[in-house]
Amino acid sequence: MYKKISMNDKEIEHAINNEVDRQNEHIELIASENYVSEDVLTAVGSVLTNKYGEGYPGKRYYGGCENVDVVETLAIERLKKLFGVKFANVQPYSGSVANAAALATLASQGDKIMGLDLASGGHLTHGYKISFSGIFYNSITYSVNEDGILDYEAIKELAIKEKPKVIICGYSAYSRIVDFKKFREIADACGAKLMADIAHIAGLIAGGVHPSPVPYADIITSTTHKTLRGARGAIIMTNDVEIAKKMNRWVFPGYQGGPLFHAIAGKAVAFGEALKPEYAAYAKSVVYNAREFSNYFIKQGVSIVSGGTDNHLFTINVNKSYGISGLQAEKILGKFNITVNKNTVPFDELSPAVTSGIRIGTAAMSSRKFAKWKELGAIMHEILQNCVEFSENESKHLDRIAELKKQVEALTTEFPIITKY
């Protein structure tokens, strides 16, 4: 379990300790969240936060960088080993910054880019109209088919017709294996560069349970805090020396100034943890648990986008299955200490602020070695079935609500947060 802290600033101490309680006592099913180790927390909270050092190891614009050079070099070398790449940048503050730098590396303002649309499982930074990617680039989108699965032939036809400068593959809510080889063939067919955003599946790739884009993509981006189980931030990788030079310039001085060395240290620690043999077992458990969990809902007749999962997440169409919105589902589950996020489904008729679905991920609870997925599924199924009744007539169901909360509490107690990996 995470431990509470003591600070002179009692207001911030109170907020942090409340969050410690929340994380310890809640079932965490947000697919983009995980639990970092004590070592990662120590690195992120270290004196490295005091150091400024624009530039790269050995080529800084500030003095006194000998120790942070060691930290950043370790992060780079560990990352290169983890994914089998020749060049890596560990400085991006976030996935959005990494994607901005990667797109700028491969395309110019106004060029055409092609990514999966948001409702189908794409990300804001893959060309959504209110994102920089949709404002500074001419964005066109591909989508999944009626079954919620990528249709590679349809994507190829669109790419040949539109001739984008960059094709983006890798998603925030797609539950099936991404065929990077087919995307390479599509990119070659239309003369495009291929950008793989593996933010969600990076840890699965590192653990050997999802194919790698390294042999096929021109440039690869990822966050470090999802399945990689690291400090918050991002990375960019490539095997092309010229692309590496450009991406480094776009990170600094293009989009960022001084690196966050405390965060880079946290990334380095997480990369080291992911290089251990035990990490492969963790990645395998994440996928197994996601299938086990999704299969419970499928057996209850619940609508799952694409009909199941091959990775760490799946999306439930709660509008179709329970007659409620994703927002309603997120709120009612939250009252029972089960944390999810509302999410659009393919061809969603509800707005992104409301949605028809909820996205479920198993990365965080797998870090706790959680093993009672059917029991959790039954609790969630009952809550979602009774969402309106529990919300509007709570006083009539106090005993049952209390019992369900007690069951959730028992699960979090049985499977506490693990802080050493």
From Swiss-Prot:
InterPro entries according to UniProt: PyrdxlP-dep_Trfase, PyrdxlP-dep_Trfase_major, PyrdxlP-dep_Trfase_small, Ser_HO-MeTrfase, Ser_HO-MeTrfase-like, Ser_HO-MeTrfase_PLP_BS, SHMT-like_dom
Q: Does the keyword Amino-acid biosynthesis apply?
A: yes
* Biochemical pathway: One-carbon metabolism; tetrahydrofolate interconversion; Amino-acid biosynthesis; glycine biosynthesis; glycine from L-serine: step 1/1
N6-(pyridoxal phosphate)lysine modified-residue sites = K226
Write the signal peptide boundaries: none
**NCBIfam families noted in UniProt:** PRK00011.1
Which protein are we looking at?
Answer: Serine hydroxymethyltransferase
Q: Which species is this UniProt entry from? A: Mycoplasmopsis agalactiae (strain NCTC 10123 / CIP 59.7 / PG2) (Mycoplasma agalactiae)
Traced from the root, the source organism's taxonomic lineage reads: Bacteria, Bacillati, Mycoplasmatota, Mycoplasmoidales, Metamycoplasmataceae
